[in-house]
Structures are given as structure tokens and as C-alpha cells.
Amino acid sequence: MGRSRSRSPRRERRRSRSTSRDRERRRRERSRSRERDRRRSRSRSPHRRRSRSPRRHRSTSPSPSRLKERRDEEKKETKEIKNKERQITEEDLEGKTEEEIEMMKLMGFASFDSTKGKKVDGSVNAYAINVSQKRKYRQYMNRKGGFNRPLDFIA
């Protein structure tokens, strides 16, 4: 290692001209950062806006969820149109008793046919398969972070 060299007096003089300006600027920045630290809350949760009205974001392309919603709405509209088209016609009324005709007008159908093996629109075919999942255990004792903290999230 070489010996430390002191600055030349000329360089020191040149620096001294702007020191008062620099010192003032540094002091202002320091006070500003201190205020910012004081204002910052200690909570880790993301900052909530004061106004409850939703913010408007301008984006060129709609988000995937919006596209999906739009597609779902279009499907619903097409289904509604199909349902409207299926009105009771004169051909349907042929060979029916008055009671059956009355029932058709009230309920929208005349007979109690089975739908087994037929495709049915709507939520009629919304069934779920019983999926057995492996049980997830939560560790209560001997945890790394100690006891006084929330349990680990298990989805």
C-alpha cells in the first residue's frame, strides 16, 4: 500500500466555493428523507387509497378476465336467443288435451320425458367428481420463527 497523500491546497480552494451550496442541498435532502421515513407507516400491508372509487387504468388490450367475461356474456345472449326461438307452436298443441295445453303454457313443457342420454343446456349437468386429496398438516410446535406468529398458509 502506498502512503496516503494529502490534497493539494488548490483543489481544496476550488471545492470550498460550492460547499455552502452543496451543504444547503444536502441538508434539504436529508430533512426530506427524514420526513418521508416519519410518514411511512409500520404496517406491511399494501397501502390503501383514501377514496373508495375504483381507479381507471388505461390499457390498450383488455385483461384476460375481461375477455372471458365478454365471451361468457356473448354465450348467454346466444342461449337466450335460442330459448326465445323455442316457443310453443301449433304443431306442439296437436293431439294434446286441454290439461296438457294448460300445463304447457304454465310450465313451458307438456310431458315428463326423461333427459337420460340427451344433451341438456344449463346448470343441470353441473356435477363434481369426489376427489380425495392428501391431508395437509400445520406445524404448531417447534416452529422456526417461534410461537408468536401466524400459522403458515395452506391452500
From Swiss-Prot:
Mind telling me which GO cellular component terms the entry cites? Answer: U4/U6 x U5 tri-snRNP complex
- InterPro entries documented for this protein: SNRNP27
Tell me which residues bear Phosphoserine: S61, S65, S111, S114, S132
Region (Disordered) residue spans: 1-96
Q: Name the job this protein performs.
A: May play a role in mRNA splicing.
Describe the subunit structure: Part of a tri-snRNP complex.
State the name under which the record lists this protein.
U4/U6.U5 small nuclear ribonucleoprotein 27 kDa protein
Species assigned in the record = Mus musculus (Mouse)
At the highest ranks, the source species' classification is: Eukaryota, Metazoa, Chordata, Craniata, Vertebrata
